Every structure is written in C-alpha cells, then in structure tokens.
C-alpha cells in the first residue's frame, strides 16, 4: 500500500498588519460603546437636575 502525499495547510506566523488592524478596530468599537454609555448617563443626570430645578420632582420625602 503506497501512501500518497497529502497537501496540508502550512501554518504561518501572525500577520502584524492584520493584528494591528483587528486591535484598532476592536478598540474603536469598545471606545465608542463606552462613550455612548457615558453620554446616556450624562443625559439622564442632566434631565434629573433640570426636573429638580423646575420643581417637577423633589428629593425630600413628603410626610
């Protein structure tokens, strides 16, 4: 039984440019999501203080 040669995929080392691109993309996506989260929190805080200033809400418990 003569064994034939099977073509296997040769493993290459990591591509530096590809790794930089993937890292940059993931960093920008994560940074954008973090920034959007903080904008949302800032909007909620500003809305709370605006309502407090207008007298629509109060932080004092009514008895």
Swiss-Prot record:
InterPro entries: COX5C. The chain crosses the membrane at residues 16-34. The keyword Membrane applies. The keyword Nucleotide-binding does not apply. It is found in: Mitochondrion inner membrane. Keywords: Membrane, Mitochondrion, Mitochondrion inner membrane, Transmembrane, Transmembrane helix. Its main location: mitochondrion. It comes from the Eukaryota. Coiled coil: none annotated. GO terms for cellular component: mitochondrial inner membrane. This protein is one of the nuclear-coded polypeptide chains of cytochrome c oxidase, the terminal oxidase in mitochondrial electron transport. Belongs to the cytochrome c oxidase subunit 5C family. This is Cytochrome c oxidase subunit 5C.
């Amino acid at each position: 039984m003569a064994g034939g040669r099977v073509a296997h995929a040769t493993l290459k080392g990591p591509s530096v440019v590809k790794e930089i691109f993937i890292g940059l993309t993931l960093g920008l996506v994560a940074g954008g999501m973090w920034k959007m989260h903080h904008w949302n929190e800032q909007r909620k805080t500003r809305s709370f203080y605006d309502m407090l200033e207008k007298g629509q809400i109060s932080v004092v418990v009514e008895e």
